[in-house]
C-alpha cells in the first residue's frame, strides 16, 4: 500500500494584520507537513479586492519567515486562478451540478423575512433549481444570474474531524450555495474546494470558525469527483480577557512583537503550546516541536493568550541564547537608542552581561546604554549624597588594587575581597558607591562582571573623580 504524501496549506486573507491566532493556524499545518516530510503550501485568498493588497501579503510572508516557517509552494494567489474557477463552474453547469438562479436580492430578502416571521431557518427555496418535470419561471430580461451548486437532497455529510471527532450535518440544513456572483466572480467556498483538489491537499488544519463551511465544501468536492481531505478544526484562540483574539479586541500584530524585542523562537514555542502539548514540556526547540507534533495531541478546548507566560518564555530564550547571536539581534534596538555598538565596550560582552536579567531585547539595549554613555559628570551634592566620606579611604585602596588586576572577572573579584578584608566592611557598602561613581546609578549587574566590560582604565578614571 502506497504511503500518503502529506500536503497541507495555510490560506489567509490578506487584510494587512496578522496576530498570534492567525500564525498558530499556519504553525500547525507547517509542523504537520515537516513532521511527515510533506509539503506546506501558502495560498492567498485574495478574492475580496476591497480588503486585499500586496502590502498585506508581504506582512504575512514576513511574519512566517521571521518565525522560520518555510514554504514549499507559493504564495499562490486565488485572483490569478479566476479562469480556472470559471472553467470548473462552466463544466458544473453543463453537467447539471450547478445552475443559474435569477432571484433578485430584493426577492431573496423578502423570502428570508417571511421565513423568519414563520420562525423558519432563512434559506434559499430552490425556486430556480432544475428538476425533472419542473417548470422554471421565465428568465427576466437584463438580469445577470448567480450560479448555485445543486446540494444533495436528503442524507447527511459525515466526517471524522481529527480534533473534534465525528461530525454529522444533515443536507436538509444546507441550501444551494452560490458559487459564482452575477459578475462571474467565484465565491469563497467554491474556490477553496477547487484549490484543495488542484493542489492535492491531504490535510486541512484550520480554525473551527470553518466547521460550518466544511459540509458544503465536502459536497462540492464529491460532486467534482474528489475525495475529501482529513479535516482538523482548531479551537479558537482567546485574548487574555477571554474574548476571541482580533485586531478589534486589541490583539498585537506579529510586527508589534518584533518591535517589542521578542525572539522568534520564543514566539514559536509559545504558539505551539496554544492548543497542543507534549507531556509537561514547556520550553523546547523548533526541531523538537516538529519531531513531536501529531494531530492527536491537539486540544479541544479554546486556548487563552497569556502575555505573562509569553514574556516568561522570551526571558528563558534570551537567558539561554548564545551571546554573539543575541548581540546581532539586539543591534537594531541599540542603534535606535543612539548606541554605537562598534565603538566602546565589546557589544557581545555587554549583551552577555545583561541577558540573564532581561525579558526583551529592548531591555538589553536599555541596559547597554550605561556602557556606551560618557562618564557621569557628578556634582558635589550627588557625590555627598551617594558616596559617604567614610567609604572614600576604601575607594582609594580599591583604585590601587584595581591597578594590579589583569582584566579578568576573577582578578577584579580578588581586588574587592582584598579591600573588604582590609577595611572590615561588607560588599554592599563598597559596591554601591562604586556603581554610582561608575554609572550614576546603583542598579547594575555584578560589579566584577561590569568591570570586565567597562575596562580597568575607564573604571579607575571614573573612580578617581569622586575621591579627589
Curated annotation (Swiss-Prot):
InterPro entries hit by this protein: aa-tRNA-synth_I_cd-bd, aa-tRNA-synth_I_codon-bd_sub2, aa-tRNA-synth_I_CS, aa_tRNA-synth_I_cd-bd_sf, Glu-tRNA-ligase_bac/mito, Glu-tRNA-synth_I_codon-bd_sub1, Glu/Gln-tRNA-synth, Glu/Gln-tRNA-synth_Ib_cat-dom
Ligand binding (ATP): 247
Localization terms from the record: Cytoplasm
GO biological process: glutamyl-tRNA aminoacylation
Entry EC number(s): 6.1.1.17
Pfam families membership: Anticodon_2, tRNA-synt_1c
Principal cellular location given in the protein's record: cytoplasm
Record GO cellular component, one term: cytosol
Catalyzed reaction equations: tRNA(Glu) + L-glutamate + ATP = L-glutamyl-tRNA(Glu) + AMP + diphosphate
UniProt motif 'KMSKS' region: location: 244-248
Record keywords, A-Z: Aminoacyl-tRNA synthetase, ATP-binding, Cytoplasm, Ligase, Nucleotide-binding, Protein biosynthesis
The keyword Transmembrane is annotated on this UniProt entry: no
Family matches, as PROSITE patterns: AA_TRNA_LIGASE_I (PS00178)
Top-level taxon of origin: Bacteria
CDD domains: GluRS_core
Motif ('HIGH' region): 12-22
Gene Ontology molecular functions: ATP binding; glutamate-tRNA ligase activity; tRNA binding; zinc ion binding
Region forming the signal peptide: none
Subunit details: Monomer.
Family (UniProt): Belongs to the class-I aminoacyl-tRNA synthetase family. Glutamate--tRNA ligase type 1 subfamily.
Protein purpose: Catalyzes the attachment of glutamate to tRNA(Glu) in a two-step reaction: glutamate is first activated by ATP to form Glu-AMP and then transferred to the acceptor end of tRNA(Glu).
Protein name: Glutamate--tRNA ligase
